[in-house]
Swiss-Prot record:
Single Gene Ontology BP annotation: protein transport
PROSITE patterns tied to this protein: GOLD (PS50866)
Keyword Aminoacyl-tRNA synthetase listed: no
Lineage: Eukaryota, Metazoa, Chordata, Craniata, Vertebrata
Protein location: Cell membrane; Endoplasmic reticulum membrane; Golgi apparatus, cis-Golgi network membrane; Endoplasmic reticulum-Golgi intermediate compartment membrane
Coiled-coil annotated residue ranges, if any: 145-170
UniProt motif (COPI vesicle coat-binding) ranges: 218-227
Residue spans, topological domain Extracellular: 24-194
Protein name in UniProt: Transmembrane emp24 domain-containing protein 1
Signal peptide start-end: 1-23
Keywords linked to the UniProt accession: Cell membrane, Coiled coil, Endoplasmic reticulum, Golgi apparatus, Membrane, Protein transport, Signal, Transmembrane, Transmembrane helix, Transport
Amino acid sequence: MMAAGAALALALWLLMPPVGVGGAGPPPIQDGEFTFLLPAGRKQCFYQSAPANASLETEYQVIGGAGLDVDFTLESPQGVLLVSESRKADGVHTVEPTEAGDYKLCFDNSFSTISEKLVFFELIFDSLQDDEEVEGWAEAVEPEEMLDVKMEDIKESIETMRTRLERSIQMLTLLRAFEARDRNLQEGNLERVNFWSAVNVAVLLLVAVLQVCTLKRFFQDKRPVPT
């Protein structure tokens, strides 16, 4: 009964919405993803706030456009250039530990004068929890009930499951980006194949007509017929 009561209390705590504490700091930074169209000859920058002493992972892919490449730079809140890449199709970079402030991510398509690029990028922060949040749900269980339930094992299992689920979501997002890039590439190839196939058919028809006309001329008797 005590173990059942502990499990019920744990389930109720997990279903309850988080309650803010008076004077608490700003909400934690959330992971994010974004897909945008970068015009030819343009540069576009984004700013992302980051807490201190955390881990920031940046992943990007060019999923559309001729060449599938772009220039990428990443700057710290102090203006220090952390990453600089030229004509890359994708990249993964980790900043650890982070500084408190706004990180600057720039994508540059200035080298292209005609082709626009479809760019996907994702920002992943480490999932750090305050000690109060980690220990908060343990307080929902009476001390005597904790004797029958291995609270540390439960916390460890939940944390492992949450981490794996978050990583699974991130991997699915990247797979969607890969799929979008491959689909755009295949659609572009299909358009080129259809165009040149139509050109070849038109040339074949033209050659066939010319051959028929030429043969008909060979067999035409243009000599005058005596009367």
